[in-house]
Regions:
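Hinge/lid segment of periplasmic solute-binding proteins
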Residues: 45, 49, 116-167, 192, ...
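Conserved N-terminal structural module of periplasmic/extracytoplasmic solute-binding proteins
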Residues: 4-7, 22-122, 141, 183, ...
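Short helix-initiation/N-cap motifs at beta->coil->alpha
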Residues: 91-99, 118, 186-192, 267-281
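Periplasmic solute-binding protein
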Residues: 123-128, 146-184, 210-236, 319-326, ...
């Protein structure tokens, strides 16, 4: 993350280098395709000679080789049909952003890659990504569920491939029954009422990981409540932070009130997610917020659980991942790479991928293969799902916001101070973009 932020400040000459070779086969630096010239004319190979493509993907299987083998098997028919060879490289999560930064700065990036929204805008800003708009037919646009989540600056810079792991409010049905809570809460007020009943029965109502080192915890700790209060993080153009609205402050006050009223234990300020996970699995918590991918562990632990997709204040809202395929502008084979992206996103390909990594379908030509318990989230509650916007420098902004909210939970800042100071930093940073 730090390397990415530094790169946006110092530039590192990336705007020039993205015109270099991608996957070892890029066009010469400084050259441009003539307007109206079909990229296919640039990409034609001598009869019988295979076109080489480089694909970067992250690991989702139990080990890197499983991912590599899965994608190689999925892409084998595509290779045969298009006289090409696809080199699949699995990039570990631990150095994912650094790998992209280093490779693209030296002109050695892939033809087609996988990015999450938070990292995307910096590469768009430096011209490293090519929009997919000209490669999508009307039928494609009708087929895909989440194309809007890959639109940045009014262009289709990304095609969502993994949309899921929504953050939901889990509850322990056994504990709620013991506390006399007969109905799952739907609103903030009902949630507090349920917490009051749990506390009265000697049960820890709720827990949050305010001691966790990762600012990604905001996906559970603050962002859902901001959206539920009717707020948002940034203006649509990404030029201004607006989480210091009345809704943003209301969300912070609500969270802090849970601690003030004893529904969040004092230990919340030192807790990390793994500790909360173990507490819920151990039947010690009434509620926790977590991704849908945590459900199998809860079931295996013997917890009689259910969930609420989102509490409501002004509206419903919760975080969902929307990770995407991106087309690198330095690729010499854009047409074929875009064609490969659409092939990977076809129902047949996604069905094979989801056998390894269960996620919700991204298009209408695939049946639902994820946990049936969460099917309604993606089919009936899409309007409540929010992704983090692709805003340049947002990682540093989230870091400051998280630290100030942690200070709020420690009682060192008021909710107003935590939000307003974070927004002040954010808008000063955004003004430099």
């Amino acid at each position: 993350m730090k390397k990415r932020i530094i790169s946006t400040i110092l530039t590192l000459g990336l705007a020039a280098s993205v015109l270099g070779a991608c996957g070892g086969s890029g066009q010469a630096e400084g050259t441009k395709k003539a307007e109206g010239t079909s990229p296919e004319k640039v990409e034609n190979k001598a009869d019988g000679e295979k076109t080489e493509l480089l694909l970067w993907m992250p690991p989702f299987g139990t080990e890197d080789t499983l991912d590599k083998e899965t994608w190689e098997n999925i892409l084998a028919p595509f290779e045969e049909e298009n006289n090409c060879h696809v080199t699949v490289e699995i990039i570990p999560w631990a150095n994912y952003e650094e790998k992209y930064l280093t490779a693209i700065s030296s002109g050695q990036g892939p033809d087609l890659g996988y990015m999450y929204m938070e990292m995307m805008n910096d590469y768009i800003d430096m011209g490293a990504l090519e929009p997919f708009d000209s490669y999508l037919s009307d039928a494609d646009k009708e087929k895909f569920y989440y194309l809007d989540k890959g639109v940045v600056n009014a262009k289709q810079y990304a095609l969502p491939i993994v949309v899921g792991n929504a953050r939901v409010l889990y509850y322990n049905k056994t504990l709620l029954n013991q506390a006399g809570v007969s109905k799952a809460p739907e609103t903030w007020e009902e949630f507090k009422d349920a917490c009051k009943s749990l506390k009265g029965a000697g049960i820890t109502p709720f827990q949050q990981q305010w001691g966790d080192a990762s600012k990604g915890s905001l996906n559970e700790l603050y962002f859902p409540y901001l959206w539920q209060a009717g707020g948002d993080l940034f203006t649509e153009d990404g030029k201004e932070a607006i989480f210091n609205s009345d809704a943003g402050i209301k969300a912070a006050k609500f969270i802090y009130s849970l601690k003030e009223e004893g529904y969040l234990p004092d230990s919340t300020t030192s807790m990390n997610w793994n500790e909360i996970n173990e507490q819920f699995k151990g039947g010690k918590l009434g509620f926790c917020v977590a991704g849908t991918n945590k459900a199998p562990g809860f079931t295996e632990a013997g917890v009689d659980w259910d969930y609420v997709t989102t509490l409501k204040d002004a509206r419903g809202g919760t975080f969902v991942a929307a990770d995407c395929l991106v087309l690198l502008s330095g690729s010499k084979h854009k047409d074929l790479s875009a064609k490969m992206a659409l092939y990977m996103l076809s129902g047949e390909s996604m069905t094979k991928f989801h056998e390894m990594a269960p996620f919700a379908p991204v298009a209408k030509d695939e049946e639902y293969h994820d946990n049936e318990d969460f099917k309604k989230i993606y089919e009936e509650e899409q309007d409540s799902l929010h992704v983090l916007p692709a805003v340049k420098g947002s990682a540093a902004i989230y870091d400051i916001l998280y630290k100030n909210l942690q200070l709020m939970m420690l009682g060192e800042l008021s909710p107003e101070e935590a939000i307003n100071e974070s927004a002040k930093y954010a808008n000063e940073a955004l003004a430099q973009n």
